[in-house]
């Protein structure tokens, strides 16, 4: 078995990924609507795709169902995945599996290119795929791979960009330089932080190697020109987003940093103790895998001089970049695990660096039986990782603590259409503290409790064109804010979702 694995690592890699997908119930999850952790942000993503489909708008005119501002028009990350998903709806119908599937394809692409990168530093073997399996089975990385958010696609495209720039470094091929630049541009457009770390760290290493006369001025100049182009693309999109949101008076998407110095000491300690080392820790990986990462970090430090010169320096810049990011976005770590996804990049490269050292410096010196034993240990760790991922995915998708709104909202749209409520009719939806969870579920534009604060007024929404009030919690039927508008009941679903005519 181990001999076959060493001879066919890429087959084994995607076999393990397929096993991970099946064991973690990916066959069902891929068709789930937004749910569980960060249903709010997931629904925003779905809302972008659905409105592209329904409005037929262009790539540069994104909007959501929430009518804050002008007709719901608002932008954030480059919406190419939502745009592609919205257009695929025209051919295959509106299915959540299309959007989740696009993200998962990006995840697979990233796995493939990371495998290709590692192949440039060590011969193809079981050791080569081990770091990738640990990344692929990280529960929170996998959770967002089979999801709607753009973080994992951004990281995946940056792995592709890195591979092509590494090939350029070895061959001076302009074709590979251009392809890598395109991948890095797309990665940073999706997420400037998650998609940009790998590119910036590589540029830093290349610059140092140039100072040591390991590269020509022409190569450095070409890389700098491409980096300026990537930076220009990011700046151009950021400038457009600010202009677009200002034009449409919609600033629901935050575009700034969340630095640690905005927090008081008590809150900082809470994030460290209760979130990073508490609530979130189980979703990073199984404890034994985290201990293994700690061991790799220790070896990375004490065996520094023996490590691959490029990998040790590149990994160092990844660590420094991630630490800088953590300081600048630390406030978000309290409630958002996806803000921490960037940290998987230095983590996996620490493992890659140490594994390459083992492969080139340690294994050739030990008996074959010990190598065999190491292979068994690696397969065992992979099995533990797959099992932990399955458990976390099951918990996230089944536990009531992750249910934020009435789950029946995703079954209501056919009822609305039977009642004569058109997809274009404006509604008021409550309760819903998010901009788009219920609106995206009902597939109707309108207003929620989000971004209204003291201006929340059903009568005002009715004057703006809202025709119906949909309440998905019986307790809200008795709230003074809604009682005057619950006179014309025109339909209900499962005795917990009520539809009222506001006209």
Predicted regions: what they are:
Residues 199, 406, 410, 414-454, ...:
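Short periplasmic/luminal acceptor-recognition loop of GT-C membrane glycosyltransferases, typified by
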Residues 35-36, 337, 368-419, 433-441:
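Membrane-proximal, lumen/periplasm-facing interface regions of secretory-pathway glyco-
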Residues 15-16, 182, 203, 224-229, ...:
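Signature aromatic-anchored transmembrane alpha helix within multi-pass, membrane-resident enzymes
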Residues 98-122, 159-164, 302:
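Transmembrane-helix motifs of polytopic, lipid-linked glycan transferases
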Residues 119-125, 161-177, 187:
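Membrane-interface transmembrane helices that cradle and orient dolichyl/undecaprenyl
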Residues 44-51, 55, 198-310, 323-333, ...:
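Transmembrane-lumen/periplasm boundary regions of multi-pass, lipid-linked membrane glycan transferases
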């Amino acid at each position: 078995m181990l001999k076959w694995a060493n001879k066919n690592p890429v087959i084994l890699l995607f076999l393990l990924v397929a096993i991970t997908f099946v064991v973690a119930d990916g066959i069902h999850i891929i068709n789930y609507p937004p749910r569980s952790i960060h249903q709010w942000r997931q629904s925003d993503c779905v809302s972008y795709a659905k409105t592209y489909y329904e409005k037929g708008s262009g790539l540069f005119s994104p909007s959501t169902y929430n009518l804050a501002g002008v007709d719901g028009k608002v932008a954030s990350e480059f919406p190419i995945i939502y745009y592609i998903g919205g257009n695929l709806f025209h051919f295959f119908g509106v299915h959540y599996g299309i959007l989740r599937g696009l993200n998962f394809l990006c995840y697979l692409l990233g796995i493939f290119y990371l495998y290709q990168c590692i192949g440039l530093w060590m011969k193809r073997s079981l050791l080569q795929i081990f770091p990738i399996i640990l990344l692929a089975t990280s529960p929170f990385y996998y959770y967002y791979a089979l999801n709607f958010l753009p973080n994992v696609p951004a990281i995946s495209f940056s792995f592709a960009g890195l591979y092509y720039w590494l090939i350029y470094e070895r061959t001076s091929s302009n074709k590979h330089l251009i392809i890598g630049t395109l991948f890095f541009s797309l990665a940073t457009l999706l997420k400037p932080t998650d998609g940009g770390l790998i590119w910036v760290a590589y540029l830093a290493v290349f610059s140092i190697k140039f100072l040591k006369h390991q590269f020509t001025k022409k190569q450095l100049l070409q890389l700098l020109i491409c980096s300026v182009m990537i930076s220009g693309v990011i700046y151009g999109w950021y400038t457009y987003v600010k202009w677009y949101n200002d034009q449409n008076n919609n600033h629901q998407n935050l575009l700034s940093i969340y630095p640690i110095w905005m927090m008081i000491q008590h809150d900082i300690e809470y994030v460290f103790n209760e979130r990073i080392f508490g609530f979130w820790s189980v979703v990073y990986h199984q404890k034994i895998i985290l201990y293994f990462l700690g061991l790799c970090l220790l070896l990375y430090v004490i065996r520094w001089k023996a490590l691959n010169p490029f990998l040790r320096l590149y990994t160092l810049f990844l660590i420094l970049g991630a630490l800088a990011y953590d300081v600048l976005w630390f406030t978000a770590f309290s409630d958002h695990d996806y803000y921490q996804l960037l940290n998987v990049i230095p983590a996996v490269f620490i493992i890659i660096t140490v594994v390459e050292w083992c492969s080139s410096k340690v294994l050739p010196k030990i008996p074959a039986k010990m190598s065999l034993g190491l292979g068994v240990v690696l397969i065992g760790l992979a099995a533990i990782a797959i099992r932990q991922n399955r458990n976390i995915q099951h918990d996230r998708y089944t536990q009531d603590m992750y249910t934020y709104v009435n789950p029946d909202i995703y079954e209501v749209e056919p009822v609305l259409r039977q009642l004569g409520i058109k997809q274009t009719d404006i509604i008021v939806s409550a309760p819903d503290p998010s901009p788009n969870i219920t609106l995206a579920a009902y597939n109707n534009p309108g207003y929620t409790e989000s971004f209204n604060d003291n201006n929340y007024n059903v009568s005002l929404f009715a004057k703006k064109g809202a025709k119906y009030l949909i309440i998905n919690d019986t307790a809200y039927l008795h709230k003074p804010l809604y009682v005057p508008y619950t006179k014309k009941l025109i339909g209900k679903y499962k005795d917990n979702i009520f539809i009222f005519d506001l006209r």
